Amino acid sequence: MRAQIEPDFESARKKYDEILEQILAYTDYCDEFGDEDGEEYRKVEQRLAKISGKDMSKFSLHEWWEAEGAENLAFDIALPEPKVVPDRTKDELRQIVERMLAPVPEFDDDFLEAFYVRVTFACKGAYFAEFLKLNFAQTFSFELFERREIEGVMRELSANEIVEILWGKRG
């Protein structure tokens, strides 16, 4: 698959430690001094936006301990967003869908081992789900990846079925 479609793990790897450090430092600051007026939050948001190039409004630096942890939040902030790829192919779409449906492979690389699942999971914010939402806007739905009753049987759609639905009206 072309590099412009693949998640940019190398960029994420380069930014990850600095972003994680900012998140944990903010937590320590809040534990010691509080941040009732949100002034420190806004400062950290600005620093993270500068590091990542992302709109930080979709991330919560306050509640990471109730969500998936500081490490996952740091990765999500560090990973560059998917882009619109107007000349995507059906084969590339099939590769994406197959990755999303496949078990997570094992990696010798600790960074990939820890975070690869975050790009393939079919949920809001996951890289490939967001790529599909962006590039197949007319046909994408998270429900394509959920179990459903089909002809009286509870099952998931196959990769081919999902590809045909998504490709049907190219986004």
Where are the regions a protein language model picked out?
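N-terminal leader regions
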Residues: M1-R42
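Generic structural signal for well-ordered, non-membrane alpha-helices
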Residues: E21-D28, Q46, F75, D91, ...
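N-terminal acidic leader/helix
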Residues: I96-F107
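Short, charged, low-complexity loops and linkers
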Residues: R2-E6, F75-P80
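Short amphipathic N-terminal alpha-helix
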Residues: P105-F115
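Compact alpha-helical subdomains of small soluble proteins
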Residues: E32-E39, K43-L79, A114-G171
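Short amphipathic alpha-helical segments that mediate assembly, nucleic-acid/protein binding
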Residues: Y16, L20, Y41-V44, K90-R94, ...
